[in-house]
């Protein structure tokens, strides 16, 4: 499985951070596989902003800094900033699919980075878009 590149949606991180029983174990396996280098992860800056917002809303600034430090220091994670190309593609995806703009931005980033899978537990993501397959953390965990 080495060399598999995935784009990870916000909810996969939140499943682990919030210990959400339905998705916790499989999402944790996916994130552990990134830590071990079994998977290479692409993380849009939007995902980081969404996660940090939760920490700051709950006045957990120390947890926010810890999360950010972990993301930045992980050599198996590539953080991708929103570019003009990704923004324009996001608008097209939103217009064609009706996805919420943040989801379209994550999908656009995944397409731009030519990842193998878009990992999300969001049932509103299309199963496939422009050749990119969306996969649930449970399905990916079985492949690891």
Protein language model regions, located:
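Active-site neighborhoods of divalent-metal-dependent phosphate/nucleic-acid chemistry enzymes
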Residues: 78-117, 121
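Active-site-proximal, substrate-binding regions of enzyme catalytic domains
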Residues: 46, 50-52, 56-78
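Short, well-structured N-terminal submotif of metal-dependent ribonuclease cores
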Residues: 1-43, 56-66, 140-144
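A short acidic, helix-capping loop that chelates divalent metal ions and anchors anionic groups
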Residues: 14-16, 50-53, 89-90
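Alpha-helix capping/helix-boundary segments
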Residues: 12, 47-48, 86, 105-106, ...
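Acidic, PIN/NYN-like endoribonuclease modules and their adjacent C-terminal/linker elements
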Residues: 1-5, 107, 112-144
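Short, conserved active-site loop motifs that form the nucleotide-linked donor/cofactor pocket
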Residues: 39, 77, 132
């Amino acid at each position: 499985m080495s060399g598999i590149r995935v784009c990870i949606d916000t909810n996969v991180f939140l499943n682990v951070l919030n210990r959400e029983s339905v998705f916790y174990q499989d999402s944790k396996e996916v994130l552990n596989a990134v830590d071990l280098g079994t998977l290479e992860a692409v993380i849009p800056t939007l995902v980081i902003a969404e996660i940090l917002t939760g920490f700051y809303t709950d006045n957990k600034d120390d947890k926010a800094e810890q999360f950010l430090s972990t993301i930045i220091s992980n050599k198996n994670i590539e953080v991708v900033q929103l570019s003009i190309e990704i923004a324009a593609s996001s608008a097209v995806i939103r217009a064609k699919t009706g996805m919420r703009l943040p989801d379209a931005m994550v999908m656009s980033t995944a397409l731009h980075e030519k990842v193998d899978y878009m990992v999300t537990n969001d049932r509103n993501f299309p199963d496939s878009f422009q050749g990119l397959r969306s996969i649930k953390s449970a399905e990916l965990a079985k492949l690891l």
